[in-house]
Swiss-Prot record:
Protein name according to UniProt: Large ribosomal subunit protein uL11
Ranges in a coiled coil: none
Key words of the record: Methylation, Ribonucleoprotein, Ribosomal protein, RNA-binding, rRNA-binding
Main function: Forms part of the ribosomal stalk which helps the ribosome interact with GTP-bound translation factors.
Keyword field contains Magnesium: no
GO-annotated cellular components: cytosolic large ribosomal subunit
PTM statement from Swiss-Prot or TrEMBL: One or more lysine residues are methylated.
Length: 143
């Protein structure tokens, strides 16, 4: 028989840096999950990724206080900021441009996010990421 699901928790956790401090500790503590067990499993699962890379994580908590988690790909905005070499997006994206990315960089981002994108083909996925870049004030070349 399948376990009864008690709830879901969605968090963005830095790769390899999960610890019991906020926001992880309080979120898991409310559901009665063993916080250190999650931190150890998450850090082991993200040990092959760049430390500090924000990983959106969906944790399923069961009624017996056990858990499973699914890791998604890093947010497009983070990957775009990294590719453009900027600290943050523009406050006024239509007038003030803060960085520049080209098609090759967008293709790399699409390959990273491939599993989480719902686009039909590569060009549609690139256009999706390019739209995110434009809304951040990043100039897109070659699209």
């Amino acid at each position: 028989m399948a376990k009864k699901i008690d709830g879901y928790i969605k968090l963005q956790v830095p790769a390899g840096k999960a610890n019991p401090s906020p926001p992880i500790g309080p979120a898991l503590g409310q559901k009665g999950v063993n916080i250190m067990a999650f931190c150890k499993e998450f850090n082991a699962a993200t040990s092959n990724q760049e430390p500090g890379l924000p990983i959106p994580t969906e944790i399923t908590v069961y009624s017996d206080k056990s858990f499973t988690f699914i890791m998604k790909s890093p947010p497009a905005a983070y990957l775009l900021r990294k590719a453009a070499g900027i600290a943050k997006g523009s406050g006024t994206p239509n007038t003030a441009k803060v960085g520049k990315v080209d098609r090759a960089q967008l293709e790399e981002i699409v390959k990273t996010k491939d599993a989480d994108l719902t686009a039909a083909d590569l060009d549609a996925a690139i256009r999706t990421i390019a739209g995110t870049a434009r809304s951040m004030g990043i100039t897109v070349e070659g699209v």
